[in-house]
Regions:
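Alpha-helical recognition segments enriched in aromatics with Gly/Pro capping
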Residues: 1-32, 47, 119-329
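Alpha-helix C-terminal capping/helix-coil junction sites
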Residues: 54, 100, 128-129, 257, ...
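Short phosphate-binding/catalytic loops that engage adenosine nucleotides
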Residues: 58, 132, 455
Length: 469
């Protein structure tokens, strides 16, 4: 299995630190709003990487954080007149709903930055003790970039070039820094902002230290794969390497994976352009399996363009898979013959060739586009060779292969059983009773159960409205 490593800019054979186990960290979203389709790309891509590793027999410890303290969260909290914690917890729950809709498996651990402050203070103190960090008069703590001789190795940036650029960009209030390149590990509190007590001042951590600490706590000093969007390569991941390797005296991550940007109608997605699309908005038009298919139908390192036409194409393509699976299921249930014929045995063996093609694509830096091409070859094979005369065992064998490959991609080949309207109404009524009784855990369970069955709830003044995804 080969992975393109951003660190070396080449494909490398994947060799885990410990045989049969993979330690993987993926930078998660900053939770101040509903996630947008740009956030969705790394979630879907690296969930698929995880699924393939598990398919190959690896035990994957998959950690993905929520950044729940940030300027954007604080700004939103001030605008709404609520606490930053209320904002972050609200959008963590909304993010989990969207992840369930996209069939993104929950991480082994979803740490939250605000729950790991003690670890951050401890790592900063270690860096100070080693001479890699220093505090200034107002209590701000900075990392000494030039003391880490390998700084720039991930982004392949030259320190001298960075120096001139950063000197021009130095903002007011940072004149106490020893060097313009030095970045913040801890910052003093501001009026109305959340803060924690530290040896240097009451304040909060810098963004970069959060992931270094959460990765160390839940995965150890060294990990196999660190992943995220390509916008995180510099400065975030570069700074993570500096902090972690200077603190732990070990190589932080063996393989660095980054997905490319997503544009909308060939333009960068932004609120100012009015083309900002949330996953929730997409779910009102399409089953989120369609969004997942769309994301996987391109190589993760290639820029991806989102458009209505491409989503329609993805919807139609996904239907070809589900319709083929439906026909196979129907044939399995209705076939009069049960035993495989000699010809069918040969055809089943031939079908395994598509599994090999699928695996070859995935083992070449997780080429999901080519893996999907192998799935469609299997669909064509099934449509041609499974007929009304086919045995139940043959139809079942082909269906099992199709379902297996789709499951690795997080796609449901066989449509979920339709949930009846009465069942939905009964569950909504139970949820309302749970909320009245302040049993919010049960209410959330019911909501998630319905979401998993493709039912979206919307709480309104007139009561709870629901619709099928």
């Amino acid at each position: 299995m080969k992975i393109f490593n951003t660190l070396t800019r080449q494909k490398e054979e994947f060799v885990p630190l410990e045989e049969g186990k993979v330690k993987m960290y993926v930078c998660g979203p900053t939770v101040y709003n509903l996630i947008h389709i740009g956030n969705a790309r790394p979630m879907i891509i690296f969930d698929t990487v995880r699924r393939y590793l598990e398919y190959k027999g690896y035990e994957v410890n998959y950690v993905s954080n929520f950044t729940d303290v940030d300027d954007k969260i604080i700004k939103k909290a001030i605008e709404e007149g609520v606490s930053a914690e209320e904002i972050s917890q609200r959008y963590i729950e909304e993010c989990k709903k969207d992840m369930a809709g996209m069939n993104v498996k929950p991480a082994t651990t979803h740490p939250q930055a605000t729950q790991e402050i003690d670890g951050m203070i401890s790592m900063i103190q270690t860096l100070m003790d080693k001479g890699y960090a220093y505090a200034v008069a107002d209590g701000t703590v900075y990392f000494r970039v030039k003391k880490f001789k390998e700084y720039g190795k991930l982004s392949h940036k030259n320190l001298d070039d960075l120096q001139s650029g950063f000197r021009a960009l130095q903002v007011s209030g940072e004149d106490q820094k020893e060097d313009p390149l030095d970045f913040v590990l801890w910052k003093p509190k501001k009026e109305g902002e959340p803060y924690w007590t530290s040896p240097w001042c009451d304040g909060r951590p810098g963004w970069h230290i959060e992931c270094s600490v959460m990765s160390k706590k839940y995965l150890g000093d060294e990990i196999d794969i660190h992943a995220g969007g390509e916008d995180l390569i510099f400065p975030h991941h570069e700074n993570e390497i500096a902090q972690s390797e200077c603190c732990n005296d070990k190589i932080f991550a063996r393989y660095w994976m980054h997905n490319a940007f997503l544009n909308i109608d060939n333009r960068k997605m932004s609120k100012s352009l009015g083309n900002f699309r949330t996953v929730r908005e997409i779910s009102e038009q399409y089953d989120l399996q369609v969004l997942r298919f769309f994301m996987l139908n391109a190589h993760y390192r290639s820029p991806l363009n989102f458009s209505a036409d491409l989503m329609e194409s993805s919807k139609n393509a996904l239907e070809r898979i589900t319709e083929a699976a439906g026909r196979l299921k129907d044939r399995k249930e209705k076939a009069s013959a049960v035993e495989l014929t000699e010809a069918e045995e040969k055809l089943l063996a031939e079908a395994e060739g598509y599994v090999k093609k699928f695996e070859e694509a995935m083992e070449d830096d997780f080429n999901t586009a080519d893996a999907l091409a192998a799935v469609f070859e299997l669909v064509k094979f099934a449509n041609t060779n499974v007929t009304e005369e086919s045995s139940a065992t043959f139809a079942e064998g082909i269906l099992e292969i199709l379902v297996k490959l789709c499951d690795v991609l997080g796609l449901a080949a066989v449509k979920k059983e339709e949930i009846l309207d009465k069942e939905i109404e009964d569950l909504i009524a139970e949820r309302q009773e749970a909320r009245k009784a302040k049993n919010f855990a049960r209410a959330d369970e019911i909501r998630d159960e319905l979401l998993a069955k493709g039912i979206i709830l919307k709480d309104t003044r007139e009561g709870v409205k629901w619709k099928r995804a």
